[in-house]
Structure formats: C-alpha cells, structure tokens
Amino acid sequence: MKSKDWLNRQKRDHFVKKAKKKGYLSRAAFKLVEIENKYKVIEKSKYVLEFGASPGGWSQVVLEVNPRIKITALDVLDFKLNHPNVFFHKEDYLNFNYDKLKKNFDLIL
C-alpha cells in the first residue's frame, strides 16, 4: 500500500478515530480488548512479554486491565509509552538475550 493510500485509509478508519478518542497509541489496542473480554488472559497475569510492542497500544490495554502487571516489551521501533511497569528493550527479538530477564512470563503477546 502506498503512503498516500495508507494516510487516506487512516483518516476514514473508525478504529483510528476511536483510538484517538480513547487516547490509545494504536488502533490495534481494540484487538487486545476483544481478546481480553473473551478469554480474561490479562487479569490473571503478573508478568507479560510483548513482541513487536511499538508504539505501545497493547501495553496500554494490559495496564488498564491490570495496573500492577509488569511488562517486558521488545521492538526495533521506538516505543511511545512511558510507564514504570513497562521495561522496553529496543532490540530485535531474534537477537535478544532472554537469559538476562531471569523471570517466567504468564502471558506472551
């Protein structure tokens, strides 16, 4: 998709407008909201590992559902969410040293 086409789609997209209204960093947040409403995977978790975490929309949802949860987020792109419970690593998940985490995760996104 060309940049111009993508921008035009973004302007018309219902979920883009809804995300801005709710303060979400991305429209993808609503996908995780639907998953959580159906399966309740976030509220039971303590530690989350999130791949492809940029810009931070899913992390926002995770923290809304469970404010005490700890999130380890990985992405090669910039992460826009600043929160004390989110530990962001700007790295490729294929090259990341997982041994340094020293914890088990309840949920992987």
Question: Model segments located where?
Answer:
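Residues at the starts of beta-strands that form the adenosine-phosphate
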Residues: 47, 68-70
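Active-site catalytic pocket residues across diverse enzymes, especially alpha/beta-hydrolases
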Residues: 39, 66, 97
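Conserved SAM-binding loop of SAM-dependent methyltransferases across substrates and taxa
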Residues: 55-67
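Residue-level signature of catalytic and energy-coupling elements of molecular machines
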Residues: 32, 52, 108
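Conserved SAM-binding motif I beta-strand of class I
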Residues: 63, 70-75
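Class I SAM-dependent methyltransferase Rossmann-like catalytic core
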Residues: 1-44
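Conserved class I S-adenosyl-L-methionine
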Residues: 44-54
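S-adenosyl-L-methionine
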Residues: 74-109
